[in-house]
Amino acid sequence: MRRGRRRKAMIVLWGCVAALALCAAGALFLLLRTPQPQEVEIPGARGNIPATVQMPGKLARGGEVPLVVLCHGFTGSRLGDGHFEPLAAQLAEQGVATVRLDFAGCGASAEPYTAYTLTNMAADVDSVIAWMREEYGVDGPVGLVGHSMGGRLASLYPQLGTQAVAALALWSPANGTGLQGLEFLNIEDFSQVEAVAAEAEANGQAGTKWGVEISADFVRQMRESDPNAALRACGLPVLLTYSGQDAVLSEATMAGTVSTVQSLPGGTVETGLFAQGDHNYNNADAAVDAQLDADLCRITTEFLTAQLKN
């Protein structure tokens, strides 16, 4: 009789231990698991801003949660040519929150493309940073990732924006001085770029071969901006990448920006990894394309984690 009772007690005990282990494993999984990205509408100065939020898992946070804002390029979207989602996932694993947004006239934005200006983009970044702090309790330092025109915006943001930022990652920024920053509109003939700019300034807007109309405000703000001077003035840590098969930016623009970032105390330049990439860090060969994405996300994650988490 006693043995039977003892055996039943042991069975119950082991059952309780197993149940506790399962509960602990489940709780640990929930703490470690990276939450699913959330599609949101963020209130902005001109209306709602379509965006995607990626928060880190609870255990990955480890105190303050830094934030990185991902800024796409001209006629782009928050997909970031396929690079923003994997980058956001990798940053989340390191305890860094991200928000990627559609600027005016791009992606799911309801605004016309003529609202796509540097000051409007900076205002949108202001709005999403403030909203992330209020809605998600993000309380750590902020970094920006910008591709192409988004890289120009990120370079200028310390001058144009109202929120403090601690680091910049620039992917092939369109950082030519003044109107040279619009060279991608017609890289073969800059006189055509000047003609489009003049038309926009005369008529309020002008069409482009990219299928969108740019505004006089955008042209004026481009003409008056010098992103490399802004980088030198802000003195922030900067990661700069350029690809080897970029067909929309001039060698002069790339060389000037490389020289600027190399002169910064916290400047890092990486071009060798991307010799086979185009302006969007893509390649027709699937294996090469995957490696470009992996390298781009890896070095950006390493840089931002080092700057924002330490």
Q: Over which residues does each language-model region extend?
A:
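N-terminal cap/lid segment of alpha/beta-hydrolase-fold proteins
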Residues: 29-62
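Catalytic nucleophile-loop/oxyanion-hole region of alpha/beta-hydrolase
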Residues: 42, 78-80, 106-139, 290-291
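The alpha/beta-hydrolase serine catalytic core
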Residues: 49, 152, 159-305
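Active-site glycine-rich loops that stabilize anionic/oxyanionic intermediates
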Residues: 65, 72-77
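The serine-hydrolase catalytic nucleophile loop
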Residues: 76-88, 103, 252-253
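Conserved alpha/beta-hydrolase
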Residues: 88-110
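Alpha/beta-hydrolase fold nucleophile elbow
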Residues: 136-148
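Glycine-rich nucleophile elbow surrounding the catalytic serine of serine-hydrolase chemistry
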Residues: 146-156
